[in-house]
Amino acid sequence: MSSAVSRSGLPAPSPLLVALVAAVQAWVLWPLFTPDMTAYLIPWLETIRSNGVADAFARPFSNYMPSYLYLLALVSPLAAWLDPMSVIKLLSVAGTVALALAMHRLLGALGVAQRTHWAALVVALPSVAFNALLMGQCDAIYVAACLMAVAMTVERRHVAMFAWCGVAVAFKAQAVLVAPFFLAIAIQRRVPLVQWLAAPAALLALMAPALLAGWPPSDLATIYFRQAGTFSNEIARNAPNIWSLAGMIAPDFAPRLFGLALAAALGAAAWFIAKMQVVRFDAAGLVGMAALAALLTAGLLPRMHERYFLLADMLILAFAIARGTRAGFALAALVQIGSFAAITGYLGLGAPMVALGAACMLAATWIAARPLAVPNANDNPPTGRNPGPAVLQPPFRYDIEQRLRFRGSGE
């Protein structure tokens, strides 16, 4: 499998310009906050400070997994000198740095030149900056773990791939949005089932400190289910997907589409996994397919939020950098615009921005899905012939090397 190297004339971003943009965003956004900050994050920090680390983790006090709370406890001493909001945002900034480092690692696996400059671009992206500097969220941490898992996929290090998947899920349930990609890879490459156990092992390892402190196992096992139970009856919450559009058109009827949305997402995931068994991609193409998996699931699952496309943002950016084409960067820009538009809709600009975001995401998903959507001449399994690469409507294109036999080749 060939290594993808940026081969266009597009220059890497100037580190000085990236730093300037990031600094301006920090200056503007740092004093601002969202309701989640005062309703959840600050009370959790105060619980850790008032009870002490050991006593705080002896009983449930959050609807987040303990993994994030460990980090919150680690930075809690800073609250003696800084206000609680700044402490939480500093942790989010540290998560953003981890995300940039993970991007650097993924670009290294893809053989990208000037990857340090490209990875630094992450900290200046609006969707990343608003997530950390305004909302104080930890989404960058689970996304960083997912990028590491994709890097391990490119390098065919499957135990590490599954371990990073477990780490990602330990921070946020949204990590499962890219699960169809890893499942497809594991099936296609016939990864031994024993190696799959690295994912739950990593997850359990991160839960162990809380369990030892006295956190009830039953509570840990149901945290994500209880998170889902707190969602309102809306079919989507400012998510840039088709269900937000449905909610705008028919707000009273849209919640009844929950079953249809779930079935559509599961069907799309099954289609994705099946098609991945018969099409082989180069290294950059694999990253593009990981982005497609995140776009499909976040785009079709019900009850998605505006922040849930951050993973797709990062994966499609890595794909664009590795391809090094203007078309690839246009696709990444489309996803970034869609994601950021939905965030601004949540922040008060309302339904028009969410609708714009949904339109961008739908277009990007269709473009990204074209390599898998190109059908064979008939419904029979592919022959041993190697047709030319599947081509998106110019200038959008993935360099698909060839189709595999239906039974797989162990690649």
Descriptions of predicted regions:
Residues 1-27, 108-119, 282, 288, ...:
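Start-transfer (signal-anchor) and selected internal transmembrane alpha helices
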Residues 115-136, 140-151, 161, 165-174, ...:
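Membrane-embedded helix bundles of polyisoprenyl
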Residues 31-46, 59-74, 232-242:
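Extracytoplasmic catalytic/substrate-binding loops of multi-pass membrane glycan-assembly enzymes
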Residues 66, 81-101, 252-263:
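Loop-to-helix entry region of an early transmembrane alpha helix in multi-pass inner-membrane enzymes
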Residues 100, 109, 228-300:
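Aromatic/glycine/proline-enriched transmembrane-helix motif characteristic
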Residues 101-102, 142-158, 315-316:
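Specific aromatic-rich, kink-prone transmembrane helix
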Residues 3, 221-240, 273, 290, ...:
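Transmembrane helical bundles and short interhelical boundary loops of multi-pass, membrane-embedded
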Residues 3, 177-201, 211-212, 311:
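Perimembrane helix-loop-helix junctions
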